């Protein structure tokens, strides 16, 4: 296999006699003209490759295909403008960057006929072009014998410059010369890639007035690259290269960096609008100072940084080095080093983007350091390209840390603002009962307040459970009333006593279930006296029905926040802990006393209501408005109470309430109300624990509310009693 491979490799290297007897020569093409045709085809491939956005490796591979093709075929039979698109189409597939046939044809048309509009894809001309390109691709494959893997000199340039620890200037110049050798000479047909690499490095050494010292073994650097290379061969090929450069027209010396074109297009509008002429003159001056070295330095800026990873990879390494120098320098265009420099606006990428173009004025004795300095001036992107990843990270570590600190400070400020606002709301809530009302309901709350003031406390408390039960129908107005009542009770202890009296009256009317009331009353006396206020419900005694339904509602997140927590905690946005904390500490002693003395009485009736919600709902069937609320509540309270039995508290109810508290707690923490959360957790357990008992105890009152609750709601404050007889 290796022998066959060597023979195949030898097949594509020709002697001078063979080159002089090429098919084109046999068809009467002048030697200089043939070389010019090759250079033009390479120039077209470079232009198309940039427009198609393929890597420089793909472009170089296509150029080698073209050179080899014309050692078998003649330019007279296959014009270069026809073969180049097919060669690039094939190379793109070989290098795993395939492009659509339609795109290749359109780009070729744009490069060859920039003034004409693109052909219609349905036209005969376009279909003919498609057919011709496909046929030419097949011909190229057969001509090349399907030998599509190409070894480029760039890989060996990178290896050698690493080996001798060459400076960046030297490495960049050598790499640039390797690309020029493909575009402008037939070295790829005469010498192996290692030999061409030695020629490029040797030329770069002369260019930069640099001499690579002899190794400690007494060997010259090129002996480590290719043993067949001699100093005489290097001098001969260098001289030939320079002669070709002198003969080559300026328009064929331009080798673009396709990424530079994109960067130039982005800045073209700004540059053209501001000072196009001035910038052009400035760049021309800089180019005249150190033209080719500048370009080479820019193109090669990444080669040295990538060399560390490259040495062991022949093809992939070569591609990486190619891509390195070409693709990673956005601000540069490739210009082959030439004795004279010209910017010609006739070619595709030659608009005022010439900012990125670098002409090459070949004065060999130029100093590499000057070239590198001017290269820094010409290309803003080069410095960044030269920095290794570690250096870049170290360089920007402080900036990143500062940015991170700024972000953290901003986040902390936002959280503190949220916490401050929440605390203000809570403090305001403690002092002013009206603030406790749920924010979204405030609008509707105002019109209702006068009416609520007129309404009896009993009616308000009865509404509280109704609001909880009648979630869909009258949740909003009832919640408002309930909250008003809650705050009034918290601020005025007399209101609690009045409500107790009212509830007693209702209790007398609904004496049907005293036993249950007594049972629940026990829990209410010692637990609800403290948990009532924290809950922040109407008069802090939302009946068991209400709380059971509310807690079950908590499971229904839609209503849980609107009904249950609107009544049990001031607002979803305010920390339940804060509100409860404030309410509990402000009034717990007083209300506990009042609730103990008074809740015993009114809590009894409310508890029976909870125990017999179904019966009560049937009793209140006559009540148009309150009955549906009771009925809807019945299932929830029943479900909650069923397992609880004596206390009328359900473990599921407790869990639901706990889940809701946890959810609100997470919401508060998300908003940054961190200070209040510890208190929230202190009361979460008592909340749920007392809530269920309270459901029993408070249900005494709220049970009252539940039973009586249907009547008051329909007729509101004045007519609550009339509906009951009905």
From Swiss-Prot:
Modified residues (ADP-ribosylserine): 416, 474-475, 531, 549, 552, 563, 637
Annotated region described as Required for interaction with ZMYND8, given as residue ranges: 527-570
Post-translational modification Phosphoserine, affected residues: 117, 340, 388, 495, 499, 564, 577
Positions of transmembrane segments: none
Placement of sequence motif Nuclear localization signal, and interaction with Tat-TAR RNA: 253-270
Annotated InterPro entries: Cyclin-like_dom (IPR013763), Cyclin-like_sf (IPR036915), Cyclin/Ssn8 (IPR043198), CYCLIN_CCNT1_rpt2 (IPR047320), Cyclin_N (IPR006671)
Modified positions (N6-(ADP-ribosyl)lysine) in chain numbering: 485
Pfam families (UniProt xref): Cyclin_N (PF00134), CycT2-like_C (PF21797)
Compositionally biased tracts (Basic residues): 507-530
UniProt-recorded name of the protein: Cyclin-T1
